[in-house]
Design a protein with these regions (language model features):
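N-terminal glycine-rich phosphate-binding loop and ensuing alpha1 helix
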Residues: 2-49
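Short beta-strand scaffold positions
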Residues: 49-50, 170, 201
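Active-site acidic Asp-centered loop
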Residues: 100-102
Length: 215
């Protein structure tokens, strides 16, 4: 079975200017996920979808393939599914596609490898994503989500909510073509027990949190 990684990294960012180029642990943010995917040693090919010449040059130096990002995918209106659609159109000959993000620099190579192994060896699931379990009393749109206020469970019995970390997604080619989405109908959520691995760097506050972990 052929497995590839696709890493979307655009040059421009809105909330944190040049976010993907900010330095973290002595190197630009975008380099961490590329290097971690290489270290995982579980992909037939690693692709970086980018519009940045600097990132393209780094990919060449690491023998990583480049997908030239089309301009509309660099707009704030584009999302991860849009990028995955475009990438699969350009590289259609894989059995499994994994999408990883530069904003998850602490995702360990062994975790990446474990996610790939899980999806490839378990037919029960058609997709996978990294996640955390969130415990507490949650509400949405004035309604309780995971408990009934008039029947209070013990805190240790409360059902957790599953939160995507948005660091890694994987899906079979068959499921992708059926659902046109990076998550299929039978996903496995891979729980990250190390809080550091679940960090998603999207705001200046996130970077401050990351610095706390690395100081």
């Amino acid at each position: 079975m052929k497995v590839c990684a696709t890493i979307p990294i655009k040059e421009r960012s809105t909330r944190v200017p040049r976010k993907n180029f900010k330095e973290l642990l002595g190197k630009s943010l975008y380099k961490h996920i590329i290097d971690n995917c290489l270290a995982a040693d579980c992909f037939n090919t690693i692709y970086v979808d980018t519009d940045s010449e600097e990132i393209k040059n780094y990919c060449v130096s690491k023998d990583v393939e480049v997908i030239d990002r089309k301009p509309e995918l660099s707009l704030d209106t584009a999302n991860g599914n849009d990028v995955l659609h475009y990438d699969i159109e350009n590289i259609p000959n894989y059995d499994f596609y994994f999408q990883l993000y530069a904003t998850a620099p602490f995702l360990k190579p062994k975790t990446i490898r474990a996610c790939v192994d899980k999806l490839l060896t378990t037919s029960k699931y058609d997709s996978i994503f990294t996640a955390t379990e969130e415990y507490g009393w949650y509400w949405y749109s004035s309604q309780p989500i995971n408990y009934q206020p008039n029947i209070l469970p013990r805190s240790q019995d409360v059902a957790p909510l599953i939160k995507e970390t948005t660091g890694l997604y994987g899906i079979s080619k068959q499921a992708y073509h059926r659902y046109r989405c990076r998550i299929g109908a039978r996903p496995y959520y891979f729980i990250l027990n190390d809080p550091k691995e679940s960090i998603d760097l999207d705001t200046l506050r996130d970077f401050s949190r990351a610095n706390e972990y690395t100081s």
